[in-house]
């Protein structure tokens, strides 16, 4: 195969050169001659061909600049017909012909009649021809690297195509490179406008290009021809009218299709890039010395093109020995795939037209035909419908990822292959019969079953892919030539799914995707998609199937391509083992005794653990159709439930068609995470806390809710019984505590009053009125005469009252200000001594300079502490400076990032046992090798936990594959080791154990001053100084270094877990870490540690096998009861990123900020508005709702200007704004948030303050989807009526207590002076 390919236009240019006759002669018809057989290509022939190709390339390069020759051949001259003369009217022939055409186009009514064209193929050819006229090759270092296309008024080419356009007028033009796409454009000379193509809009339909059709659907461009290659970058994509809709950039495989990356255009020449992530730019590298590239394989010291060997020597059906030798000699060649396809398909010069022209279907046919390089085999099956047997469909291995239901099985037969090894239908099965011959059967009714019938997805060669339900055994059954065969083996099929949020089957109606692992069904040309085959083992057959004897004449029937071997003993000769390889042979033997017949296939087959160990030399490699790969899988997104609010709860209701996971977590320090699988009809009530809660329904985006203010039945502004109902529902603990204390005090007061009354009635009788009461009584009486003092009285009135009534209290109140005045006067008295050096001309001059400098650099500083919660409302403030217009300031947290410092200790995955086929020593002893890694099954694999045992007294007198005739002298070597599963190379199937040392916390804060936005990055370990537009911002450090990650974490797929994993080298069977490695070579790690509990057992004597047990994968067991991932349990609402390992948007901590605003940012007021006569009316109010209150403020403005409006009351935010003030009456309507049923806030407008007060109604909704700006009700609020009732009750109790205390004192005093009355 030569690398140089001619396009159609090149052929057209070279037609005159290759034509045998001149242009004016008629060329006779030449029938197709038989294709000449190609001679064997040697080194001398390759050199000669290289020289010829170099000369031919130079000739073609010279022809490229010449004028284009009409491709139409000479017209055939019609004999016996004279040429028509010109008409007598004197018209020229051209004018007459033009006139006739115009008349033909017009109908009877003068309308143009358009001919219908039923030749779509011709339209395609015309469009491609038009595209060729506007397409020019681009040469780079002597080779075509791509193409450039003239479209509209510009010439376009991909930016990755280097070189000059092969046209004198376009060679030196300068291109402009697009910023956001792989495209270059330039203007071309006006003389070439006739060659430019018209643009058209690329839509979802089928288009044309050089090699066939291109299908566009949902921004996915598929090359239906599959013939695109390097060097095609820049080729035009046209519609049937010849208009260009795009140019090709490159392509790549997408399953069985070829997907393209293109630049699409529209009618206005606007370009857009439709990229495919796995596409490779189709630019061609420069040729090296213009020599053809030949992919070389070797055979008998001769080199040849791997994809085109001489079919006389290579065809595996004609010369199987030569073909197998050729495959064996080129096993390590990187182009072995091409050689394998060539020797098994044996393509001729003319192929039969296939029904399906799909490249994928043709490629599948080649893959099936490649199985002709191997033969099927028979192996031991432990259960063939109740008994053990040697079965043609014996199950050798079963592979499962453990995370889904798909199984990959390997059997001894070959699916989709004919008896000779060619490609067959899906129901065909190639197998090795009991007679040692290879057969093929159609309509085999292949069935795979576990606990129920499996869905067979695909069967290629020895491998079957099926979707099976879980079970403890696996059965494969097929009908072969009318006989039903089945094989059952023990296999524990369990599905251990990783963390998932939905368990759907077929409900993938969304565009959401995620990385997943599956078995690849698209073979690729790489070593990963090949499997080794070894020398075939002999199978035992009955002697009558291969030898027939008549008296002393015996005939041996040898199946084609096999070797027959048996023991022969004649009458007068000793016993001997004879071998026959030809088709039919005859020998003479008197009284023959023929035993131990066996047939060995000439072609190799796969190594099987159910057969004894055979040859160790790899004979060939055949396709391995289903290796695991990481793919992008679509996932379902469950419909959201109906969400309603009831008090401070969220109600979810609906019907789930399949299991959906509902997870909740609080957004505070204690996440209190919950998870529940829901299916069918459901109704769930979820309480919402003031800190917030996060709900995640299936694969939908998380939803956040906050409880605003809880409310209750009853009335907070009514009588005591309604107050009791309200507060009992709202704050039951406080309400019942208050009722209990009040009842207790009343009971105590009542008891004391009763006791006092019973004692006083005797004292009053014995004592007369005391005109000089004791001082305590007088003092108690004087308390009633003390004037009351209100808290809202002026300070001077209070001082005057204290001076009049209590000199001691006055002195205490006056001591602090007097001390302050004394300190100030003392400092002023000594000020002259401190400032003496500054008095004078120098001092005053320096002072003036400092004052001037300070005045020039003066700025305004605003400080604030911002909570580090991106979900929190932004901080808003109005900056009021005397003499300047107000400025609005907004600060919000854009995101937070917690980045831990990690170290990968090891990775783990599913461990599997690898078994060396049994080494059987018949009538002799065998032993384990000193280096177990030299065993063939362990070669090329990373192994650990290797066990090798020698078993004696095995297989006594066993006939079959072992051929042991001894009873007790037979021995067997059994070797088993642990290795990594083939799924370990996929990221989603591998768990990584990290140790976390420290974490860095970063946040981005957006500061908006007026219309200017400044982004500041703040850190936990220092102060950040940033400058915006005339702003200087000093922020940080963040007040906490909180991290949701523990010291040990595990990452698997897209989830992260806090888990205390075992150290490296300390794994135990069946637990996390039973397979450990640190190497980045996941297929063959050189530091593998494994312990899967392998135990080698004594084999039973019914068949040759290796008996062992092991523990199932510890990773799969850990996934069964794994803790919840951090994406569910992380506190503070952290979002967890697995790769890289980060925690995002954690709502914890705060950051102090200082913002220096220069005077230049402020606008000086020319006149102060001086608002006066302020009045505020609360129009409406709902408490517990963001900006649920509305207020109207009226005031009089003395001058026009600007004023900032904001709230001075903590906990009652006002929608801050800057208002325009006009001279005269002004009205401002604003909103505020109130957390309580009664609101009283002070509003400041340009240093004028007005008080707004009113009553609020309960909110309609008590759960909100955004974090409220007002403070949540902590439970300590008591309404005004409740306070008055409570104050009245408490005051009454206090008065009663004081009265009782006075009575008690009076009684006590009276008792001390009472007169005892003695009856006479």
Swiss-Prot record:
Residues of the site described as Cleavage: 282-283, 353-354, 791-792, 859-860
Lineage top rank: taxon: Viruses
Location of the region described as Disordered in the Swiss-Prot/TrEMBL record: 17-41, 65-125
Transmembrane portions of the chain: 735-755, 808-828, 837-857, 1287-1307
Alphabetical list of Pfam families matching this protein: Alpha_E1_glycop, Alpha_E2_glycop, Alpha_E3_glycop, Peptidase_S3
Post-translational modification: Structural polyprotein: Specific enzymatic cleavages in vivo yield mature proteins. Capsid protein is auto-cleaved during polyprotein translation, unmasking a signal peptide at the N-terminus of the precursor of E3/E2. The remaining polyprotein is then targeted to the host endoplasmic reticulum, where host signal peptidase cleaves it into pE2, 6K and E1 proteins. pE2 is further processed to mature E3 and E2 by host furin in trans-Golgi vesicle.
Motif (Nuclear localization signal): 74-120
Protein name: Structural polyprotein
UniProt GO cellular component terms: host cell cytoplasm; host cell nucleus; host cell plasma membrane; membrane; T=4 icosahedral viral capsid; virion membrane
One GO MF term attached to the UniProt entry: RNA binding
Region feature (Dimerization of the capsid protein): 203-213, 239-243
Cysteines joined through disulfide linkages: 297-306, 381-487, 384-389, 454-468, 516-633, 909-984, 922-964, 923-966, 928-948, 1134-1146, 1176-1252, 1181-1256, 1203-1246
Site (Involved in dimerization of the capsid protein): 207, 240
Active site: residue positions: 160, 182, 233
PROSITE patterns hit by this protein: ALPHAVIRUS_CP
Lipidated residue numbers (S-stearoyl cysteine): 1310
Transient transmembrane before p62-6K protein processing as annotated region, ranges: 760-784
InterPro entries xref list: Alpha_E1_glycop, Alpha_E2_glycop, Alpha_E3_glycop, Alphavir_E2_A, Alphavir_E2_B, Alphavir_E2_C, Flavivir/Alphavir_Ig-like_sf, Glycoprot_cen/dimer_sf
UniProt catalytic activity: Autocatalytic release of the core protein from the N-terminus of the togavirus structural polyprotein by hydrolysis of a -Trp-|-Ser- bond
